[in-house]
Swiss-Prot record:
This is Uncharacterized protein C14C4.04. It holds the Pfam family ThiJ_like. To S.pombe SpAC18G6.12c. GO terms for molecular function: catalytic activity. GO terms for cellular component: fungal-type vacuole membrane; Golgi apparatus.
Length: 267
């Protein structure tokens, strides 16, 4: 079977425009044959150092798609962004765009963001969500998150619900987020892409932190899909409703791929 690949298509970008109506609320999206309801998404965040682009752009995309987007951290505290991406000299090279910064200002004032779920609470589960997204980031706290036993346990329960043969849930990762999936499912045939060596080296030249090891080395070779050397590309797994991206430049394409996966899972 050939590897399913999602490639970039033309778009007017309207999904990423700022809200024009301050009273806008999510539109219920229903499962086929069932009463309409609002779909729920969970964005998993480190306590500090999350990547602004990898978090804010998907948040706006899926809120505009009609999802109720919630957040979760390991301790239940409000997550703090990687400030290098918002201000300072390094932000000129590796920082977020002005559009993303505008989204950040809006997202960081929402009730959902200011009241994240506590993943350490043993009653917390991902099973209540239709879509779970684990973004990455260059801050050391991101690596602590994706390697945490608690996140591994939560994902181990959730991933089987994403099986294409019988599942109705969707999973997504970006960059370092893929490490969490592979740690949670070492015995499952689930594959990921993540930041390739050449991209990671380039980011360090422009001021990103130097990690203890390159991200792709955390993923078993048999489960790692490097992908082509194109600007925008994401990988969609063959056996699970799971899509992964390599770096912040893949965010918009990942969102589009996830929209398609959610539609497939609901049917």
């Amino acid at each position: 079977m050939s590897m399913p690949i999602v490639r970039e298509v033309n778009s007017d970008g309207s999904m990423l425009q700022p809200f024009s109506n301050p009273l806008w609320v999510p539109t219920p999206v229903g499962r086929s044959g069932r009463k309409h309801r609002t779909l729920k998404m969970c964005i998993v965040l480190p306590d500090t150092g999350y990547d602004v682009t990898q978090v804010c752009d998907p948040w706006q995309f899926f809120v505009k798609e009609g999802f109720m987007v919630n957040f979760a951290t390991l301790t239940g505290i409000v997550a703090q962004a990687d400030q290098r991406l918002l201000s300072g000299v390094k932000s000129w090279f590796i920082g977020a765009t002005y559009k993303t910064k505008d989204i950040y200002e809006r997202m960081s004032t929402t009730k959902e963001f200011l009241s994240p779920s506590n993943m350490s609470d043993m009653s917390f589960t991902f099973e209540n969500f239709d879509l779970v997204y684990v973004p990455g980031g260059q801050d050391p706290a991101v690596l602590e998150l994706v390697e945490s036993p608690r996140l591994s346990s939560l994902l181990a329960d959730y991933i089987p619900l994403c099986a294409r043969v019988s599942g109705t849930r969707v999973l997504a990762t970006m960059a370092q987020g893929a490490i969490a999936v592979q740690r949670a499912a070492p015995n499952l045939e689930i594959k990921s892409t993540t930041t390739p060596l050449y991209m990671e080296r380039a980011s360090y030249l422009f001021g990103a932190s130097n990690p203890p090891a390159y991200t792709y080395t955390y993923i078993p070779e048999s489960k790692y899909v490097p992908g082509p050397k194109t600007a925008h590309w994401v990988y969609s797994d063959e056996k699970f409703f799971y899509a992964s991206g390599r770096y912040s430049g893949d965010v918009e394409l990942l969102c589009k791929a996830l929209r398609n996966l959610v539609a497939s899972a609901l049917h």
